[in-house]
């Protein structure tokens, strides 16, 4: 009996020791693992695996699976498949581009650049390789190399809308807005549904408070009705041009489509505060902004200032203090508190 009891104690102790050393899996980690399991058991991946079992020397299948692995963020597997595709057939530019895509997805810009530069030399007629390389040059701010590479692509095909858009983006970042406008306009001539090009043209003209901006924002929304940034930019331009009632209407329409576009709440509040002097309405919209983002110091300050205008010193003081608890260097809130006292 004593022996049985001793064995029982040992088993209990061993079980306790094992359970104490088991790794703790958080809910987030479990959800991530479950999500990955679903992806890795997806019909697309299963179909490719089945095809590769019956045709293991097909480079195109490895390339497709590599692209799928990129989507699933399984980068080691993606690199392996891309390299297999290249080993099986090194005469296809797309396989090299897929390998570059894997490296780029991992933010490995040096390896991405090396692969794309080799690809551009090996396949000088590949506009896809040239465009990806020029985009990489743009990202790392090698603007001259980017322009030269874009021009090579345009010599092969002068109708690449993306090439003109990228040139416009480079000129815009370089401060040459005239050339930026010219390139962006060419982009929308080549592709009249190029939303980003319309939007960028709108932003350039909006900075000049030129009404032409409205046409470009409207075109962006025509090509993509869910482009909320274009709706916001349109409303902001109305506000900047003194069309306050129209701006409020546009902001409210934006919030109907996307209730979380919080800058719209703040801007409506600012119009009621600074222009219409309707402090109660201003508080209403600043409160909405705070409800969506409780760590926004400017919204607390603006609401506090509105309360101060209504003579509610206690609420004003609370908001100023909250503002400073988030950003101790928010000098306007410090001044506001001093003025209340």
Residues covered by each model-derived region:
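Terminal, low-structured helical/coil segments at or just beyond the last alpha-helical repeat
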Residues: 23-33, 301, 305-341
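Structural marker of alpha-solenoid helical repeat scaffolds
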Residues: 54, 88, 122-123, 156, ...
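N-terminal leader/linker segments that initiate helical-solenoid repeat arrays
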Residues: 2, 20-83, 87-91, 341
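Helix-start (N-cap) detector for alpha-helical repeat units in TPR-like alpha-solenoids
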Residues: 59-60, 93-94, 127-128, 161-162, ...
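Position-specific recognition of the canonical hydrophobic site in helix A of tetratricopeptide repeat
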Residues: 70, 97, 104, 131, ...
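Structural signature of tandem alpha-helical TPR/SEL1-like repeats
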Residues: 38-47, 73-84, 106-118, 140-152, ...
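Sec-dependent bacterial lipoprotein signal peptides
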Residues: 1-18
């Amino acid at each position: 009996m004593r022996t049985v009891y001793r064995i029982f104690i040992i088993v209990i102790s061993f079980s306790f020791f094992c359970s104490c050393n088991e790794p703790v899996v958080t809910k987030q980690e479990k959800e991530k693992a479950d999500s990955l399991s679903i992806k890795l058991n997806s019909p697309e991946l299963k179909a490719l695996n089945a095809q590769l079992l019956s045709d293991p020397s097909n480079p195109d299948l490895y390339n497709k699976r590599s692209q799928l692995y990129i989507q699933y963020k399984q980068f080691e597997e993606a690199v392996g498949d891309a390299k297999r595709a290249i080993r099986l057939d090194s005469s296809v530019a797309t396989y090299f581009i897929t390998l570059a895509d894997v490296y780029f997805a991992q933010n490995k810009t040096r390896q991405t650049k090396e692969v794309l530069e080799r690809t551009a030399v090996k396949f000088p007629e590949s506009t896809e390789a040239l465009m990806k390389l020029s985009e990489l040059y743009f990202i790392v701010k090698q603007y001259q190399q980017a322009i030269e590479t874009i021009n090579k692509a345009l010599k092969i095909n002068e109708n690449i809308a993306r090439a003109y858009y990228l040139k416009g983006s480079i000129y815009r970042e370089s401060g040459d807005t005239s050339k930026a406008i010219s390139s962006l306009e060419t982009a929308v001539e080549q592709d009249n549904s190029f939303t980003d090009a319309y939007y960028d043209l709108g932003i350039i003209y909006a900075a000049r408070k030129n009404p032409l901006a409205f046409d470009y924002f409207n075109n962006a929304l025509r090509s993509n009705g869910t482009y909320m940034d274009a709706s916001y930019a349109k409303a902001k331009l109305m506000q900047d041009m003194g069309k306050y009632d129209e701006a409020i209407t546009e902001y409210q329409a934006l919030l109907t489509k996307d209730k979380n576009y919080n800058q719209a709440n703040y801007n409506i509040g600012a119009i009621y505060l600074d222009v219409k002097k309707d402090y109660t309405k201003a508080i209403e919209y600043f409160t909405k902004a705070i409800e969506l983002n409780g760590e926004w110091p400017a919204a607390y300050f603006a609401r506090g200032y509105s309360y101060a205008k209504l003579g509610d010193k206690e609420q004003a003081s609370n908001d100023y203090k909250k503002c400073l608890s988030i950003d101790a260097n928010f000098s306007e809130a410090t001044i506001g508190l001093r003025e209340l006292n």
